[in-house]
Amino acid sequence: MKILYSPRRFYPVETLFNGTLSLGGRDQETTGFAWWAGNARLINLSGKLLGAHVAHAGLIVFWAGAMNLFEVAHFVSEKPMYEQGLILLPHLATLGWGVGPGGEVADTFPYFVSGVLHLISSAVLGFGGIYHALIGPETLEESFPFFGYTWKDKNKMTTILGIHLILLGFGAFLLVFKALYFGGLYDTWAPGGGDVREITNLTLNPNIIFGYLLKSPFGGEGWIASVDNLEDIIGGHVWLGSICIFGGIWHILTKPFAWARRAFVWSGEAYLSYSLGALAIFGFTACCFVWFNNTAYPSEFYGPTGPEASQAQAFTFLVRDQRLGANIGSAQGPTGLGKYLMRSPTGEIIFGGETMRFWDLRAPWLEPLRGPNGLDLGKLKRDIQPWQERRSAEYMTHAPLGSLNSVGGVATEINAVNYVSPRSWLATSHFVLGFFFFVGHLWHAGRARAAAAGFEKGIDRDTEPVLSMTPLN
């Protein structure tokens, strides 16, 4: 096969390290990369790069299966999931597996099955990765032209993009089918404190679905993270799955337009940078979603959101003091504002005290107590149910910020020794990973653009400070 360009021409990164270590001819001299540069050595070896990708997928799936079984083995049914440091079982419970009313786990067998299936899948992927890395053809273009490619082949690249989009679309529809036909999903808003239910009345109105994208990300608007019902979530997956599938078909059947051919850099490193940029956006979006949204990420499994824990504290003390005879409608706090209840900027009745900054919170344990003008004083006096009291007391003491009390918003009693909320773990990890993916995007985009412009020189090692230092040995 004729290679369209020399990897050493485009990627002449020099290193101080010993370049003699090689594997199957993939050494620094022939590839332009030292052994520790990993998959960069395989840029023009499509068969070996396939092996690396399949093996990587196997590692990911192996972790999922092993961690899944680890959590099942340590699961205690008497305690809520968020108190046990679980990060995978909450996802399975949200999908409706093994849970019943109120989010109580009735059966852990589906979780065990999930773990075993992932382990078996990882073994298949692992064998495939080893085969393609060590035994299979180095390049696919000669033996399997459908799977072969060159990075500069714009039409082939958009065809591969199309195939990926179709697979993503099918993934979105898997959730739709689970919600509609295979047992439903856990709905935290189901009457009486949440339950598993099949979704029957999808929201397919494009004005509603795409209206989320046009919302402000600030305050009570909340962009797409403000979705508060499963009908909109599943309807959104129908739209997204359809767009991905039709977009994939479009990219397979068409060739890139002239403007696209001119606008993009067409090289392996450029595609890597585009992918990292997309993953960074996904990570930042997931961070906001898991931190603020208690519909897609039910508080029964992930623990309360920050605003939810704060409002739960106000509600818990309101219930206590009302039983002791306090008049919650007129009592004043030390600032002269309402101690238990006050008015929001838009005139609604909200909880008083410091939690007023979270006045636009919506939570299933609190919504039944609202009326047309915010919290209903009559309902607060007569209609509070025991399950609402229990849940708010539980959420009050399990804030994702790791704090029960605070002064002016500064935490004073950090409780992060015996309890860290899975919501905190997931939000923080996705933000940090999203940030590093974004930095990787900038790094590889800069290298790809420089290589395309012809001035990528690598790092100048002649003036490297380490050269003037005494050798370690």
From Swiss-Prot:
Q: What is this protein called?
A: Photosystem II CP43 reaction center protein
Function as written in the Swiss-Prot or TrEMBL entry:
One of the components of the core complex of photosystem II (PSII). It binds chlorophyll and helps catalyze the primary light-induced photochemical processes of PSII. PSII is a light-driven water:plastoquinone oxidoreductase, using light energy to abstract electrons from H(2)O, generating O(2) and a proton gradient subsequently used for ATP formation.
| UniProt subcellular location | Plastid, Chloroplast thylakoid membrane
**Annotated residues for binding of [CaMn4O5] cluster:** E367
- Which gene is this protein's source? psbC
- Identify the domain of life: Eukaryota
Q: Cite a single GO MF annotation.
A: metal ion binding
NCBIfam families recorded: psbC (TIGR01153)
> How would you summarize the oligomeric state and partners of this protein?
PSII is composed of 1 copy each of membrane proteins PsbA, PsbB, PsbC, PsbD, PsbE, PsbF, PsbH, PsbI, PsbJ, PsbK, PsbL, PsbM, PsbT, PsbX, PsbY, PsbZ, Psb30/Ycf12, at least 3 peripheral proteins of the oxygen-evolving complex and a large number of cofactors. It forms dimeric complexes.
